[in-house]
């Protein structure tokens, strides 16, 4: 069951990708969707065995590589964390597969699309089921490659090419960090297996590594590189620029990769390595600060976006910040709780946005929409449910998971927790503001489309509606149903998954917070709804003119539109200097400059010039050529003996090239 659960997406990908043109589009796509549905069902069964029966399944499949003391084996680890992740991955992926059957119906390359989706699911499952760092890194790189291929699926579009390259290059920085973190793990622990590393970790908390003459705590140094990987993959502040641009791919790709699964790989990495990272207060503080700042940054940028998919993308970035700073405060169960609920309502939002885009002939600018509430009522209801769940409307899934993060953050009573909680409350208001702004601009007011566009607006087809309805039901009920399971006091589910200090029982502390603090998210929701209604519902110029003329509003708006100048600063301080270094210095002056002059080209040119001059001075006769040939043979023998004795081959080749160039009578001098 466990191995079948892992390889079914791979089988679907191979059949669709390799044999799709022989089987036909319809049959091959049905095979891919069927494999994904079976994978989701098997994941639910595995979840029953692991989660409800409170067991762990760990088995080895054989040796992968053995070099010296490095022994890497194929192994699968199914604990509570893995079970939750594979349920989320396979359920969302199966819904996206079903949705894409109609969404990509007119695309001539749809079999390739389904093959990519299934292969991505396989790599994601390989990542979360790995029992060692090397296997995890293999899955980590696999999802990065598939992200590039799926963003660039419409490869004839220049913007898709740029976005895919931007995503893969920025993720290289994160992959570089994780790679060096794995090297340090092997250096310190002499193993890459999680079981060995986590067993030894409590005994080396004081172990140090000499780095450039300074003694650095080993766990802190390893954690620093792991954090770089987390920041890259989960689009945290500093390496976040790729996520909004990744919206150039098809909308189902955005729902699967950039909302529910791939971007949560960084959060999963923190949770998986929690028995190691929990011993470094420095790393935990860094995670808290980065997550909180990412939440604030993404919220402020989302307020001023006009592309419907980019608004949801920045919302994803913001919610990932919540998960990361919850991990930094050792509140791991709340983090995985929010990850699970977020996956369902964010996939719902993206797929609902896809239905809107599909119905409006690929229009994504919210300023060119409006009045769709009567034309697409079912899509509106699904979008409304997803929006309410995201903003923390009482008794929907986001209400439980996000509130528990905010309450437990404040309940730490350390400055890091207070800092994260304050930013979280502010971001809760901002999230509600831009979510209802999206809802109002898209579905209310007068239609702002052309008449022919309005005439062609239609509700989504059955295959697109079914996933929306299922995800909407999950967005309503899954938070309430699983609350005690994830964050209930005394729940045994996480005993074998991640580690936190025993005294760090934040659930009890959050239950005795002041009433005002518990009501803050509700007030943030109320004000977040009222504000966009006042400004955007039945827009009137006299209502907006004073706001638009306010200098502070103008400057803030410009600052947010420029994305805090991150793109500008990264281009000026990193991209342009590295471009000049690589092109002007390394390429023009060294590779095609100095090295060519003193290297093969320069030596060959010098010899050609010298022998050409000699050739012009002498009379070209048969005896001259015979003399050159004899001299060449003697020179080759001498140089060969010299090369054999010294091992110096480079100059020998240069001399032979030059001499043969002169000796061949076919050479003509113009």
Swiss-Prot record:
It comes from the Eukaryota. GO terms for cellular component: mitochondrial inner membrane; respiratory chain complex I. Its main location: mitochondrion. It is a multi-pass membrane protein. The chain crosses the membrane at residues 1-21, 31-51, 81-101, 111-131, 133-153, 178-198, 211-231, 251-271, 283-303, 311-331, 339-359, 375-395, 421-441, 462-482, 519-539, 566-586, 594-614, 629-649, 650-670. Its EC number is 7.1.1.2. It is found in: Mitochondrion inner membrane. One of its GO terms (biological process) is electron transport coupled proton transport. It catalyses: a ubiquinone + NADH + 5 H(+)(in) = a ubiquinol + NAD(+) + 4 H(+)(out). It is an enzyme of class 7 (translocase). Keywords: Electron transport, Membrane, Mitochondrion, Mitochondrion inner membrane, NAD, Respiratory chain, Translocase, Transmembrane, Transmembrane helix, Transport, Ubiquinone. PANTHER family: NADH-UBIQUINONE OXIDOREDUCTASE CHAIN 5. Belongs to the complex I subunit 5 family. This is NADH-ubiquinone oxidoreductase chain 5. It comes from Dictyostelium discoideum (Social amoeba). The gene is nad5.
């Amino acid at each position: 069951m466990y191995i079948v659960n892992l390889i079914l997406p791979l089988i679907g990908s191979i059949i669709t990708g390799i044999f799709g043109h022989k089987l036909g589009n319809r049959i091959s796509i049905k095979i891919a969707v069927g494999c994904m549905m079976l994978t989701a069902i098997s994941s639910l069964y595995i979840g029953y065995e692991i989660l409800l029966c409170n067991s762990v399944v760990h088995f080895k499949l054989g040796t992968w590589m053995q070099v010296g003391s490095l022994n890497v084996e194929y192994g699968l680890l199914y604990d509570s964390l893995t079970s939750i992740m594979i349920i989320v991955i396979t359920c969302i992926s199966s819904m996206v597969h079903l949705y894409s059957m109609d969404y990509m119906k007119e695309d001539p390359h749809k079999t390739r699309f389904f093959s990519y989706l299934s292969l991505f699911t396989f790599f994601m499952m390989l990542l979360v089921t790995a029992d060692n760092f090397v296997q995890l890194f293999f899955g980590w790189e696999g999802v990065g490659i598939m992200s590039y291929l799926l963003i660039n699926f419409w490869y004839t579009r220049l913007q898709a090419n740029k976005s895919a390259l931007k995503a893969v290059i920025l993720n290289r920085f994160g992959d570089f960090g994780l790679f060096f973190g794995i090297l340090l793990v092997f250096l310190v622990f002499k193993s890459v297996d999680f079981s060995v590393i986590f067993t030894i970790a409590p005994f080396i908390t004081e172990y140090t590594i000499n780095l450039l003459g300074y003694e650095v705590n080993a766990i802190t140094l390893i954690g620093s590189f792991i954090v770089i990987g987390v920041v890259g993959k989960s689009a945290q502040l500093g390496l976040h620029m790729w996520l909004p641009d990744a919206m150039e791919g098809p909308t189902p790709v955005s729902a699967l990769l950039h909302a529910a699964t791939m971007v949560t790989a960084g959060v999963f990495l923190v949770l998986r390595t929690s028995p190691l990272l929990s011993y470094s207060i420095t790393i935990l503080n860094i995670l808290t600060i980065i997550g909180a700042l990412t939440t604030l940054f993404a919220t402020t940028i989302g307020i001023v976006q006009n592309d419907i998919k980019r608004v949801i993308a920045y919302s994803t970035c913001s919610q990932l910040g919540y998960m990361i700073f919850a991990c930094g405060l050792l509140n791991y169960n709340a983090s995985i709780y929010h990850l699970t609920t977020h996956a369902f309502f964010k996939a719902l939002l993206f797929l609902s946005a896809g239905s809107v885009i599909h119905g409006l002939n690929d229009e994504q600018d919210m300023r060119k929409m409006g009045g769709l509430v009567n034309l697409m009522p079912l899509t509106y209801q699904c979008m409304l449910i997803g929006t309410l769940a995201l903003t923390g409307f009482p008794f929907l899934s986001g209400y439980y998971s996000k509130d528990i993060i905010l309450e437990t953050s404040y309940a730490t009573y350390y400055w890091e927790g207070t800092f994260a909680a304050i930013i979280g409350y502010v971001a809760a208001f901002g999230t509600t503001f831009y979510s209802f702004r999206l809802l109002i601009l898209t579905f209310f007011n007068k239609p702002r489309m052309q008449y022919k566009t309005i005439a062609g607006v239609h509700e989504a087809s059955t295959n697109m509606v079914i996933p929306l309805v299922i995800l909407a039901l999950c967005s309503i009920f899954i938070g309430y149903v699983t609350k005690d399971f994830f964050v209930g006091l005394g729940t045994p589910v996480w005993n074998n998954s991640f580690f936190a200090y025993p005294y760090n029982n934040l659930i009890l502390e959050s239950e005795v917070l002041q009433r005002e603090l518990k009501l803050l998210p509700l007030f943030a929701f109320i004000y977040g709804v009222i504000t966009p209604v006042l400004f955007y519902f039945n827009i009137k110029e006299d209502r907006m003119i004073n706001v638009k003329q306010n200098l502070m509003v103008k400057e803030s708006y410009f600052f947010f539109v420029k994305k805090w100048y991150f793109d500008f600063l990264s281009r000026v301080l990193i991209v342009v200097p590295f471009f000049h270094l690589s092109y002007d210095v390394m390429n023009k002056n060294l590779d095609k400059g100095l090295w060519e002059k003193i290297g093969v080209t320069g030596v060959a040119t010098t010899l050609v010039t010298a022998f050409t001059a000699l050739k012009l001075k002498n009379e070209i006769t048969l005896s001259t050529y015979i003399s050159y040939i004899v001299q060449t043979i003697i020179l080759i023998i001498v140089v060969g003996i010299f090369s054999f004795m010294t091992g110096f081959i480079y100059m020998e080749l240069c001399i032979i090239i030059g001499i043969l160039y002169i000796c061949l009578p076919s050479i003509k001098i113009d």
